[in-house]
Amino acid sequence: ASSLSQLRRRRQVVLSYFEDMHVEVSEASHDTPYLFQSLLYGQPLENKTRTWTHYVTPRGFAELMPFTNTASGNHIGWHIGRVDNWTGRWESIEKAQEASKNMVLFNATVGNKEGIAGKLTKNPHILITGATGEGKSFLAELIFLLTSLQDVKCLYVDPKRSIRKHFEAIAHHPDFEKRFPLLAKHIKQINFVTLDSKVKSNHGALDPIVMLDKDDAVSVSKNMLNYLIFSNKRIKVTMKQMTAISRAINKVVAQRQAGETVGLKHVLQELTNNPDSTIFEVGDYLTSIVENSILELAFSDGNVEGLSYDKRVTVLEVADLSLPDKDNQQDVTPEDKEINSTALMFALGAFCTRFGELNRYEDTIEFFDEAWVLMKSAEGRAVIQSMRRVGRFFNNVLCLITQSVHDAEGDDDTTGFGTLFAFREDNELPDILEHVGLTDNEENLEWIKNMISGQCLYKDVYGNLNMISIYNIFDSIDPLLKPMKATVSSNLEN
């Protein structure tokens, strides 16, 4: 308009026009442009904004969730899933993922780092628990693959032998090589090691006297031999025999430190060469159970290289490993193969410990699957404890994958775990709540009962606790994490 009076007339024409059409038009005031900024959540009210005050019911205000935090995970990291804020039960993990916009990022190497604002723990270790089929191996392998792309030295101990065959088949598939050439190259560069006692060149690869320093070699050797003896309840061992075993181990380890080519087999020879018949008997018994068994992987004459610590990414598996059932009763005598396999796990644990403490200035991480096998015995718990104590000082992360939240407990457990992933285990729901620091009440029990396969409780290094839906967003990694192929029957089921 050319004048104020003309502007007012035109304004009235517009209002009358819309009024005739029964359309309500609101007139703006001079401060309307600032309305949006003034009504932003948390914006302080000024004198000019008092007429814009919004009234809200307590229920409506509570839905805004003031002073609460639903963040989970690290600020920078790899996507491993999304937070699930619903207390109900989802039909599928995909629907839970689609319903959330709150991403969970994870970086396994920052747990022990200094100067990170808000971090409540400097404990770098990770514990993944849950029943079979709930998703703990999926999560562990996802974290392993993503972390292997960083400048981190990685070791995955796979007693189930589930990774190598599947990874290599996928990486060498022509279609995968064409679509994802860089990842295929990365998988092919992983140092896959399968220790098979039937292959003579593997004998002694896990010999503790060969691969460990003096104190650890003595400790692990004693643990292995003691376990082999005491697991057979038909054998009565005297103090004289136990003393002879300890002296033989100390002698052979001292010879190794002096530069002689000796190994754990020489300990057995020391016992069988003893003129005392009772000491000869225990040496002869140990020699008999080692011969032509999986234990040959840990017994050598010292003329072996042992496992390499130099490869950046290693997957270590042991052929013919027969692990005992976790639900076996303590008074049930395990089979010989189970006893031998468990004794060998002590050597595997010692290798992991040594792997993590070689270079304190290098980030390292070990994934130890089926860790409950070690936690069933006092000797095994000591091995796990030594692996955990490497921790912060050596920039080492230990990730234990096991079935029960009780598997990592111990009377002398002071090192704990800084990061917890607890998948559903129906027989331990109250224990899971206690494990993550929640009250055991009906509301919380109902909440975790609604967890589906692929969901878990996640407690991060900042102390945040949420239910999250584990989900992989990388098309290239997806085939590596899904070893079970769909069938006609499974497709028809949907």
Task: Enumerate the language-model features and the residues they cover.
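Anion (oxyanion) recognition and catalysis
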Residues: E19, S148, R392
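Short, glycine/acidic-rich hinge or "gate" loops at secondary-structure transitions
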Residues: E24-F36, R164-H166, E260-G263, Y361-T364, ...
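P-loop NTPase motor domains
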Residues: P58-V104, V110, R161, A169-H173, ...
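Flexible glycine/proline-rich, aromatic-decorated loop/lid segments
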Residues: E177-N202
